[in-house]
């Protein structure tokens, strides 16, 4: 059904508007790049119809500005050579333009996940095999558009992707082009290692899962904070309380087994390494905590354990080698051995809260919705600000059986609501036929 709604208009590769110098031809992967999974970070940006921009001209406008932006982000236009470096050969990024037969408002009523799936490139999971970045421009019948973006995690993290989109948007909206100035220095911060010495063990599990969204209002978040304070937690953050609460609810799905579990949380290292936000690459690490103490009073204990895990990671800032994937995996294995735990569930958590994704304006206004999509990662908890900016949306992916139990959890439903297939209608301006 969904595939019949999407009509491919064109496919092409966009190359940098000027050739990459020979001196920049080799882009070395950092040690974090080398050890990270070959997954894709994807985002979809939805924009309502703006009568000041003809739909038929938006494609050419975006292609032109993308070509200029790639001069600074030349690594995206290259090709991955084994697990060693990127050959910045200017072969380009794939740009797909499609027509979606339906109005944006009607499609969003069927659920954000459904709409997001439509506007992201269908080849997005196998991205790293050729193009390191794919863009899909989707035109809706109402004149609204969506820009779907997918980048190989071998090249960039979430912060890098947002910076790229901001620079591309600025290149599109400004009358005078201002060349972006990203800092491509990740390999100097985390020097590459011999591939033969690297572990192949993954911290995430890739399989078919269900993805659902749960929304926490400002009031619900404040109640969770108050609950944490009652248990002695000092100044709990919104991300801390939502993360701990969701992991607690997910773990309770396994009752009565009371299986131990780990929480692995990603952290942006730029502020802690005194790096500017325009430092591009995989500049993050992760910290973890293990809960093997049963199900009683998990909430406050989890927050404390998460804080301790993060503090332990940040104590290693000076000796950067202890921030790498390898060292953290070794530490996790060591802890499991000490606790005599042979197997456990693992929840992989990441927060994109406070990322300025709703400020990305290509010249036709800010997006009404920014949505990630990553349904192939088991037990993923991804947090984002709600479109209004005051609540939190949690994208949860689980196996189907576990998800069925999770969404019925009474405590969960008392603090969060499931993003239903019929959300409150968004007001879409009058229809634009200029693309036809």
From Swiss-Prot:
Its main location: cytoplasm. It holds the Pfam family Transferase. It is found in: Cytoplasm; Nucleus. InterPro entries: CAT-like_dom_sf (IPR023213). It is an enzyme of class 2 (transferase). It catalyses: horhammericine + acetyl-CoA = 19-O-acetylhorhammericine + CoA; (-)-(R)-19-hydroxytabersonine + acetyl-CoA = (-)-(R)-19-O-acetyltabersonine + CoA; (-)-minovincinine + acetyl-CoA = (-)-echitovenine + CoA. Induction: Induced by jasmonic acid (MeJA). The active site is at 153 (proton acceptor), 361 (proton acceptor). One of its GO terms (molecular function) is acetyltransferase activity. A motif (Nuclear localization signal) lies at residues 211-218. Keywords: Acyltransferase, Alkaloid metabolism, Cytoplasm, Nucleus, Transferase. One of its GO terms (cellular component) is cytoplasm. Transmembrane segments: none annotated. It comes from the Eukaryota. Confined to roots. One of its GO terms (biological process) is response to jasmonic acid. Its EC number is 2.3.1.-. Pathway: Alkaloid biosynthesis. Monomer. Belongs to the plant acyltransferase family. Component of the monoterpenoid indole alkaloids (MIAs, e.g. echitovenine, tabersonine, lochnericine, 19-hydroxytabersonine and horhammericine) biosynthetic pathway; MIAs are used in cancer treatment and other medical applications. Acyltransferase catalyzing the conversion of horhammericine to 19-O-acetylhorhammericine, of 19-hydroxytabersonine to 19-O-acetyltabersonine and of minovincinine to echitovenine. This is Tabersonine-19-hydroxy-O-acetyltransferase. It comes from Catharanthus roseus. The gene is TAT.
